């Protein structure tokens, strides 16, 4: 699954900002504790025969399922997962024999189970469990859900499913755990004018009368329940052949012309993966289904043979799409298609090893994008992925990559930066350690050995070690996946003799909120090299001395494949600063990010990051300037509420970025590299957010001219320019944007316009956006994102509003996301009062076992306050020293 954050990818791109009244009550009642969700091990399903008849307008469906089961030991009852279902009949029949007496049906809503208790114990053997039931169609993206949207033909409704992690039980009474793999035969009785889609191709259609048809899909391979998919609506399907596999993109009717790049990309990626994994994709077809709308929780889902996405992550509308959108489409496909092997063909045994799915798919996404589109220069993005992980891993509420999971909510919260980004970074480090060929061979062995089965992490390590004899892969992997945290390698001394540089290294642990913590220990694969020499490698555990060929400046973690911080001494850092332009771009990024993190933690001067920004020429790689723009934007956020100091900082930041933007310009140049196109939008967004008068003025000029002169708002700039306008909007401009949103008929563009309404600096306009989010006008999938976007600039306002209107907001948030949604609204706050507010909310509404997100929000607020109070004075002093 491609995770999403509180603010959808659309909102983030529009806002150009990083993500991220409740009254504290005395002694609020504690939220109910959740029990473990794992089922008894007495029965195992082998096949589901499922028949559904959806009633889209009534938001309900009728279901009938016959499950072939093996009773593994005598039992008086059978327990499976079910939620929001009403059973009309339940029958258990031996494969050879007569049906048993009807069981007593007991529903446990809290534990999301149904238990069928029989008059006599059920003997071991094979049975068929037949159940007739009715279920609910939701309006948020879990279970079987409806999405309403507008197009040129009026209002439409489509149905889709989203089952990961634990929502197949809303569609089928089932053993809804990843280890219970079975085959599925799905039959759907649907309107004859609509298209039904599932994991497998349609095998047969039968007229069911009254304008209905029954669609029988071919039987699936053995798979986990969360990978089943069903979709229904007025769809188009564009197809192509990739070898023997039919690939398709399914869209709302009339939008398939926007699917060309996704379809072409699917063909390329499938060929690459068939080769890399050494096991051909086993299904006859592979669809990408693009739906209008968004979710707070995810942007795409790897259902086997029927990948679900939202339109913003799959389609390219020529009137609004950018180069970043194009790269995003490819990345989403590369991620979800990697899951067809890592996750679908081979699946983790339980959610504690979720990272086996997500970390690997994220790594494969980055690797494949860099290989198949080298012109995008995305290899540098690996440093940003590592930073996303370390930002989460450096605080007390972090957790190991392999983590304890007991409840549905804990499983939902496992989809985080540790699972995805740290998992990806650890894989990248291990591949670099054993070599790319040995790693690939180990992966092939793993896929072959465990196809159609379930695994734990050690199954992967075992196969990689077999492909890389003599390498302690399991030892290293255990250090980085079974314990939390970040190693820090201190460069104690550097001396050159006889053409070699001797580097003394000491390992400790990096944290940003526990300076006195006793450090953990890791076996860290370290790569060091001089500017022009060959790399030297060592496995560092405690202290190490490394001889590096050449006598020159030494970079530790050269190539940035290691998951650790590097802390240089003052003289060493000074040498790096003066030779900064000679470093490889990926090492420039790595040094910058280490400098930022170490400076904010008080381990080196916080102003060192500004020295690096000053040392960077305007001709540096676009990704370097994207990073600098991000750092400057982050520093600006710490001045929130202190106008005088903020204006001093903004003067410097704008002056630093303006020469780069002058070189890039407003207009694209023929033949310019793709990374420059991305940088242009980043600079416009950042300068607009910083209040650069020239950029704000030009953005407003283009906005006012767009109706008469379409060239004033080219597709490549439209979203970014409108974002600058919206951030700096007055009431009249906000009203105009609102009218545009109301009149727009294209769902993707409409969603973008509603997102724009939520990013204004003006508090009165932010309040109007919050009020609008509670109405039905934006649509349920946009409303929660609008509140989240307001939180990017006004976290206290957004949190207080959401909690004060919790009953209404709950209806607009995925049920799997609520424990994360509310606390994260506050995470960018600098107000100490928010700490107690978040704690009070968690005490009242969130089970103690599910409060990691709330605790993390509190930790982030505390960290931000500490940075503002203890680090920003050094930034002020640097600005004064340099005449800003």
Regions inferred by a protein language model and the residue ranges of each:
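N-terminal, polar/Ser/Thr-rich
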Residues: 24-62, 97, 153-158, 176-178, ...
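Hydrophobic alpha-helical and helix-loop surface patches within well-folded domains
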Residues: 67, 87, 110, 158, ...
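Gram-negative bacterial Sec-dependent N-terminal signal peptides
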Residues: 1-24
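Long, ordered, helix-rich scaffold segments
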Residues: 386-387, 499, 515-516, 529-538, ...
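A surface-exposed beta-strand-loop module
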Residues: 84-151, 173-176, 209-211, 543-549
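Extended, low-hydrophobicity, Ser/Thr/Pro/Gly-biased non-transmembrane segments
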Residues: 68, 132-235, 258-261, 404, ...
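Surface-exposed beta-strand/loop patches in extracellular or lumenal glycoproteins
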Residues: 66-85, 185-191, 504-506, 510-527
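Beta-strand-rich binding/interaction modules
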Residues: 88-93, 473-474, 484-557
